[in-house]
């Protein structure tokens, strides 16, 4: 092993033993070129370092190995990274979260290129747990995990990292990019869409669309298209975006989504045949955007919406009459829709198989059972927790030096503009 590499190993050991993590981070940031020049000796360097005691040194070596234009032995490197992430010292790597996240991004890209996304899911879950200060902290690796889960069509491993509300972002030594934030909410929305949790999906797409921005983002555009479709499926109309949404959404993103606005407009007429015609007209656009599946679900939701409207007019109705009024192919398809809607709790009804009559009922929920009271308690606790968080954030802003300086400056400006009472 070359003397420069030996010096690197000795410095890593010494600084790690002394607990001088800041200086160690400076060393590994400067050593990238040295390690890249000695690629053939890097496995020897790894053998000389202990993963637990010298986590930052091992991280630097693995990061450089993955940064090479071509990885000679991917399987060996994958095993090394997998072992490192599962056994490294979490306290140490939090000093170099930018490099650690960078290693995870490299691993993700390599697995995506090799069409092996499933292999990285468990590894990235461990990586996030090592990086996070708490479960409500968002890291750039969250987006990687969601991407792999989507590509592997294995959604559930991402849920523990999506079901929590994020209140903090891991800065990653200034390396955290807005792209990672947008991708987390866009991919997360797609995961929830795949699981048909449309309420949560709509929230995630909204977060991506309402992110403060000065320029058009392709991720925001795609989120906006899916936001329209999921709104129609869930609510039967397009939910209005909050007032704090960036002006670029109205100025640039809406004109780029004309086909989707047309779809929403036709949907509001409650006419399935017109909606089918519009879907045929814009099928190329919807297919290109990979949204045809959602568009078909919009059409299905319109049939359901029209069936729900019938419950407000009729107490009983034949399946044949229902199929005719809702523009379904026949009583069999009408029965299929009604059964699914009963199962999902979207309507309360029963079907008499003898005469093919559907009887509509009132909602049996009286809102007086223990489960309902428990739900109310849980919602109240969430409100109390939110109130406490807002107070803490308000206090944090109040003592922020920049805020104090700015508010003092504005007060001086105000007092300067007021005429003196003694003049």
From Swiss-Prot:
Keyword Cytoplasm: yes
UniProt GO cellular component terms: COP9 signalosome; cytosol; nucleoplasm; perinuclear region of cytoplasm
GO biological process, one term: in utero embryonic development
Subcellular localization, as worded in the UniProt entry: Cytoplasm; Nucleus
UniProt entry tagged with the keyword 4Fe-4S: no
Chain intervals for the UniProt region annotation (Disordered): 402-423
Modified residues (Phosphoserine): 407, 410, 423
Main location class: cytoplasm
TM region positions: none
Record keywords: Acetylation, Cytoplasm, Nucleus, Phosphoprotein, Signalosome
Modified residues (N-acetylalanine): 2
Stretches assigned to the PCI domain: 197-365
Residues of the signal peptide: none
Classification via Pfam families: COP9_hel_rpt, CSN3-like_C, PCI
The family this protein is said to belong to: Belongs to the CSN3 family.
Alphabetized PANTHER family for the sequence: 26S PROTEASOME NON-ATPASE REGULATORY SUBUNIT 3/COP9 SIGNALOSOME COMPLEX SUBUNIT 3, COP9 SIGNALOSOME COMPLEX SUBUNIT 3
Function: Component of the COP9 signalosome complex (CSN), a complex involved in various cellular and developmental processes. The CSN complex is an essential regulator of the ubiquitin (Ubl) conjugation pathway by mediating the deneddylation of the cullin subunits of SCF-type E3 ligase complexes, leading to decrease the Ubl ligase activity of SCF-type complexes such as SCF, CSA or DDB2. The complex is also involved in phosphorylation of p53/TP53, c-jun/JUN, IkappaBalpha/NFKBIA, ITPK1 and IRF8/ICSBP, possibly via its association with CK2 and PKD kinases.
Assembly, per entry: Component of the CSN complex, composed of COPS1/GPS1, COPS2, COPS3, COPS4, COPS5, COPS6, COPS7 (COPS7A or COPS7B), COPS8 and COPS9. In the complex, it probably interacts directly with COPS1, COPS4, COPS8 and COPS9. Interacts with CK2 and PKD. Interacts with the translation initiation factor EIF3S6 and IKBKG. Interacts with ERCC6.
Protein name: COP9 signalosome complex subunit 3
